[in-house]
Amino acid sequence: MSEFITVARPYAKAAFDFAVEHQSVERWQDMLAFAAEVTKNEQMAELLSGALAPETLAESFIAVCGEQLDENGQNLIRVMAENGRLNALPDVLEQFIHLRAVSEATAEVDVISAAALSEQQLAKISAAMEKRLSRKVKLNCKIDKSVMAGVIIRAGDMVIDGSVRGRLERLADVLQS
């Protein structure tokens, strides 16, 4: 867990509440995603860790973001710069996405398989997870050859390991005990 998670929550909550009030949740998520990527830039990271005045830092950051930030997004950047919190932007984005998922009653589900799954297989997994979690799900599919066959499904703290690799590991544990 990131060191900035506690710092990020109030900024994410304020941004999310504002976005909901102004019916611009998608726009805000896009702005935060862009700003979070800017913080990961090597040159910007040097500026963020430097001794620039908050006003100068905020204006430099806003200049780099250009038209990706609207006036309200720029205001958030200024407030975060004043408080020395621009490094927390990736965590603000993460918290914002979490608040959005809770608000929309959706859950992110990672599906890891050895090969690409068919639309029919994805539909079955989606339906089963929606029933199990009692909410809509968004599937994030990844291919990992080490799975060998089967799938690994992750939703929050829940992990369903139906992979051959997982079965072999469990069998090895039983044989060694």
Curated annotation (Swiss-Prot):
Keyword annotations: ATP synthesis, Cell inner membrane, Cell membrane, CF(1), Hydrogen ion transport, Ion transport, Membrane, Transport
Gene3D superfamilies: N-terminal domain of the delta subunit of the F1F0-ATP synthase (1.10.520.20)
GO CC annotation terms, alphabetical: plasma membrane; proton-transporting ATP synthase complex
S-S pairs: none
Keyword Oxidoreductase: no
GO MF annotation, one: proton-transporting ATPase activity, rotational mechanism
Lipid bilayer topology: Peripheral membrane protein
PANTHER family found in the cross-reference section: ATP SYNTHASE DELTA CHAIN (PTHR11910)
Subunit structure: F-type ATPases have 2 components, F(1) - the catalytic core - and F(0) - the membrane proton channel. F(1) has five subunits: alpha(3), beta(3), gamma(1), delta(1), epsilon(1). F(0) has three main subunits: a(1), b(2) and c(10-14). The alpha and beta chains form an alternating ring which encloses part of the gamma chain. F(1) is attached to F(0) by a central stalk formed by the gamma and epsilon chains, while a peripheral stalk is formed by the delta and b chains.
The protein's name: ATP synthase subunit delta
